[in-house]
């Protein structure tokens, strides 16, 4: 879940800073050599020699691309889903998006065999470009704070593996994440209690403030995991530092879109706006570090109080690791989780029959709505988890997965040299009849392994047998590290909300999305009424 997409009005390759043998990290003068690219031998086998040359990959020319995205162009004001769909219609299942402003090309592919080849050949150090501004901030602007500790989004090669290997056991272990359930449940209860203030008293339609408050729910939840602190963001009197941090996180998303996604001259000239961005990073670092320092004092007093929380385990590795990971969790775990939850709510609101089936499962788990959620009573929630997977199949907030090829590859019959960017259009395939029967239907039953109710029959035949067609959280060593936390948060809030309410979609048109760092929903015409 914690992945960043790109704005469709700006070509994807504007984000890529690779040439075929070197990767420039952070758009800075310092060049990070990825030895694995040079170490991979040049191919001379029959498959490679018989494949079509890279230059023959279909696709638009540079000026044609520019015309697409200018006002009046065919792709102007389209979101990422629309852009992918149109380009595929025009150029087929593989095409080359030309590099602009000195950047490299990117290969877009919609062939699951290409997905598998790319993933299977990425090695132990997969390369995926992340937030370049954060790399610059850590390595150039504030090296005295972060030292050699890198972030999961922005590091590559050995540096990435070093931090990932440290934090994997902390954030991917089920019991580590599930120990946060009591507090995550309490936060979800507080949000559901607040719903009456977020809907019209007569029509019961959610108001414009709903999504912003949902972000505060996501912020409150992830900050407890990252900082072991309740911020009070759902109350009328949040902690002053928490309120400041929330404002700075909003600024971060706005600045990141402008300087990490859109074309910018900041790598060559530090504009006043980019300097404000660095100040925002400073404030986030300052407040995050202060919360961690408070937690350290608290942990000293509460020694031997039971299982160590996520923050304690990160601190046992290194305080700098804890600061970097806390910042990463905050940056990656707010808009992504809240936007995904809106999408889930939308699909359930449009499918009342499935919602009723889910409500029956909720009542079995919580006969008494005031009963707390526990690891025991949340083990058996197959239909809820199937609903979440089906929502993410139909509308993922990150409709593609990106990698730099670390070996020479043959994709769909074309040579793709190592060092080239490859964008795998997963969302297009997961909405295709070729891979999912009745792909246009909301059918959670396709994800069930067995019948869960006399009226709920498993239908695995409607699910693709190819595991590379549905990859909501990525694949391999760079699988989304926030997967388990995001799932816990969404499962908990969905359980609480649908135990008390039923939701309906009132608009004629489907939910709309706009592209930012991720695909963000807007125009949420959901009615929330008391459940029968």
Swiss-Prot record:
Question: Which of this chain's residues are annotated to bind heme?
Answer: 480
Residue ranges that the Swiss-Prot or TrEMBL entry lists as coiled coil = none
Q: Name one GO molecular function term.
A: monooxygenase activity
EC number, as in UniProt: 1.14.-.-
Q: Which PROSITE patterns match?
A: CYTOCHROME_P450 (PS00086)
The name this protein carries in UniProt is Cytochrome P450 12b1, mitochondrial
Q: Which CDD domains match?
A: CYP24A1-like
One Pfam family this sequence matches = p450
Whichever gene encodes this chain, its name is Cyp12b1
Task: Look up the record and report any one GO term of the cellular component aspect.
Answer: mitochondrion
């Amino acid at each position: 879940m914690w992945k960043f997409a790109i704005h469709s009005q700006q070509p994807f390759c504007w984000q890529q800073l690779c040439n075929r043998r070197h990767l420039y990290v952070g758009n800075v003068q310092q060049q990070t050599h990825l030895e694995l690219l040079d170490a991979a031998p040049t191919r001379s086998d029959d498959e490679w020699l018989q494949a079509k040359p890279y230059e023959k990959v279909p696709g638009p020319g540079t000026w044609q691309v520019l015309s697409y995205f200018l006002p009046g162009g065919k792709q102007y004001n389209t979101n990422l889903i629309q852009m992918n769909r149109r380009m595929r219609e025009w150029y087929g299942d593989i095409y080359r998006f030309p590099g602009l402003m000195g950047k490299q090309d990117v290969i877009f592919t919609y062939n699951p065999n290409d997905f598998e080849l790319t993933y299977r050949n990425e090695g132990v150090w997969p390369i995926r470009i992340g937030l370049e501004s954060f790399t610059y901030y850590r390595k150039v602007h504030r090296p005295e704070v972060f030292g050699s500790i890198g972030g999961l989004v922005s590091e590559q090669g050995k540096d990435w593996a070093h931090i990932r290997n440290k934090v994997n056991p902390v954030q991917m272990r089920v019991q580590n994440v599930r120990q946060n359930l009591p507090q995550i449940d309490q936060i979800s209860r507080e949000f559901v209690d607040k719903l009456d203030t977020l809907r019209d008293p007569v029509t019961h339609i959610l108001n414009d403030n709903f999504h912003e408050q949902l972000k505060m729910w996501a912020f409150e939840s992830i900050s407890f995991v990252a900082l072991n602190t309740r911020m009070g963001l759902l109350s009328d009197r949040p902690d002053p530092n928490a309120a400041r941090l929330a404002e700075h996180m909003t600024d971060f998303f706005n600045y990141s879109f402008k300087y990490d996604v859109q074309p910018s001259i900041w790598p060559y000239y530090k504009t006043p706006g980019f300097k404000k961005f660095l100040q925002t990073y400073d404030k986030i670092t300052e407040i995050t570090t202060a919360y961690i320092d408070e937690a350290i004092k608290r942990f000293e007093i509460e020694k031997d109080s039971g299982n160590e929380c996520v923050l304690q385990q990160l601190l046992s590795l290194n305080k700098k690791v804890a600061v970097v990971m806390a910042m990463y969790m905050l940056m990656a775990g707010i808009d992504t989780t809240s936007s995904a939850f809106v999408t889930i709510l939308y699909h359930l609101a449009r499918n009342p029959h499935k919602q009723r089936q889910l409500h029956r499962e909720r009542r079995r788990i919580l006969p008494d709505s005031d009963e707390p959620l526990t690891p025991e009573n949340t083990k058996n929630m197959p239909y809820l988890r199937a609903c979440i997977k089906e929502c993410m199949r139909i509308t993922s907030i990150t409709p593609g997965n990106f990698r730099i090829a670390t070996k020479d590859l043959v994709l769909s019959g074309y040579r793709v040299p190592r060092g080239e960017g490859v964008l795998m259009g997963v969302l297009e395939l997961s909405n295709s009849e070729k891979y999912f029967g009745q792909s246009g239907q909301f059918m959670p039953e396709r994800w069930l392994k067995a019948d869960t109710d006399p009226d709920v029959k498993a239908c695995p035949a409607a699910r693709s047998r190819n595991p590379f067609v549905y990859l909501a959280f990525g694949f391999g060593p760079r699988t989304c590290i926030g997967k388990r936390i995001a799932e816990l948060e969404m499962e908990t809030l969905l359980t609480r909300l649908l135990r008390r309410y039923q939701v309906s979609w009132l608009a004629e048109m489907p939910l709309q999305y706009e592209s930012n760092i991720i695909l963000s929903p807007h125009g949420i015409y959901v009615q929330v009424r008391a459940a029968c």
